[in-house]
Amino acid sequence: MPRRPPFWLTLLIILIGLPLCLPFLYVILRATEVGLTRSVELLFRPRMAELLSNTMLLMVCVTIGAISLGTFCAFLLERYRFFGKAFFEVAMTLPLCIPAFVSGFTWISLTFRVEVFWGTIGIMTLSSFPLAYLPVSAILKRLDRSLEEVSLSLGKSPVYTFWYAISPQLKPAIGSSILLIALHMLVEFGAVSILNYQTFTTAIFQEYEMSFNNSTAALLSAVLMAICILIVFGEIFFRGKQTLYHSGKGVTRPYLVKTLSFGKQCLTFGFFSSIFILSIGVPVIMLIYWLIVGTSLESAGDFSEFLSAFSNSFIISGLGALLTVMCALPLVWAAVRYRSYLTIWIDRLPYLLHAVPGLVIALSLVYFSIHYANDLYQTFFVIIIAYFMLYLPMAQTTLRASLEQLSDQIEKVGQSLGRNPFYIFRTLTLPAILPGVAAAFALVFLNLMKELTATLLLTSNDIKTLSIAVWEHTSDAQYAAATPYALMLVLFSGIPVFLLKKYAFK
């Protein structure tokens, strides 16, 4: 395949990339208003060191914990047979149904002892590990056991075999998961604010809320952007260059699932049961508890208010997910099939944007809509654009995993027959990666249903979503009033999670 993409594809990815530059432009413009002397004072004060330490510790610990837990769970479930396996294959995806800020307030309502560093790390890890479990599990299902058999036949130990024969094949899934989880932890707001853990994002929100100081908030965001650039470079180095599809003759030989001994089955069952109880059991039980015994339930509003919040969440999330996936497709296709500096950097631009807190992205859209498109201010259109900016990397990660597993030989055949690249993509490539497209849509839709920060700022007072309703009531310690909205959010989020597990990651 040629390294230079077709002109129409180049133009398309540039048009997609242009609006992604707005938040960067906003951050630079507002950060320069602080002035050099004031910037030095802010960046080198003790408070900044504390925020940097807290943010980096949260990102590193949660990423390591979520990747380790997700990979270990995927390996056990794909390689071994034990009682309860079928249930836990589904149960390990269910934490995606529960927003991190909902988990936070349910744990806080149970015990205030979680308002410590390790409590925050634990809750965020339990909320994030399915983002590693799903893609790693999908790759383990498709691995050829020939490499492992060759390694073992040469006298290598199982540990050596896993490290040098299996783990390199998991690099794409693990690398994408590291990037996704790490960047998400950099900008997490709802859960860490409920758990009273101070990070750059909470400081940015406080600067805006208490002093309406957009310039200082932009300066703090610039620090996050610098950290993000390092993470993106690290992910590119970690991923490396390797062929991920089966290119030889013959068929892939799947792994044989082994049955564990009774003692090991008991240990494995206990391990998965503990994860299920901590990640799903406690939040759901506490929601039901507050629904039954809470005294603030009457503050939740009538059924019409509840229905309005649900319909707003569904419509905005659906449109946002559709736009995001449609824009992610050409970016990923260009980066994977037409590797060049232009396609790679436009493909990585959304990941850099992911390090900008949703609050700052929302502020940039408020600024540009007020000054240049006042009629669009506080409309669904601006919210959908914000969603596209926030969750484009999530769609890219899922689509990339599908496209990299597809050999480009079929596209070369189409090209040799004189077909143009768009026809080849529409008739050959797209149908082959439809499960990945469905996975991307479901994953983005799921996260948009739970999105809080940008939605808080961009919606007008007469527009309420499920996540906003939960936030408003929990901020006033009205846990019972928040429960109906939180339960609806959890139950409805189960639909895309079911689709992800059943059709996309298999």
From Swiss-Prot:
Keywords: Cell inner membrane, Cell membrane, Ion transport, Iron, Iron transport, Membrane, Repeat, Transmembrane, Transmembrane helix, Transport. Changing residue 116 to G: In strain: TN106. The chain crosses the membrane at residues 9-29, 57-77, 90-110, 116-136, 174-194, 218-238, 275-295, 314-334, 350-370, 379-399, 428-448, 480-500. GO terms for biological process: iron ion transport; transmembrane transport. It is found in: Cell inner membrane. PROSITE patterns: ABC_TM1. GO terms for cellular component: plasma membrane. Residues 52-233, 310-500 form the ABC transmembrane type-1 domain. CDD domains: TM_PBP2. It is a multi-pass membrane protein. Its main location: membrane. InterPro entries: MetI-like, MetI-like_sf. Belongs to the binding-protein-dependent transport system permease family. FbpB subfamily. Part of the ABC transporter complex FbpABC (TC 3.A.1.10.1) involved in Fe(3+) ions import. Probably responsible for the translocation of the substrate across the membrane. The complex is composed of two ATP-binding proteins (FbpC), two transmembrane proteins (FbpB) and a solute-binding protein (FbpA). This is Fe(3+)-transport system permease protein FbpB 2. The lineage of its organism: Bacteria, Pseudomonadati, Pseudomonadota, Gammaproteobacteria, Pasteurellales. The gene is fbpB2.
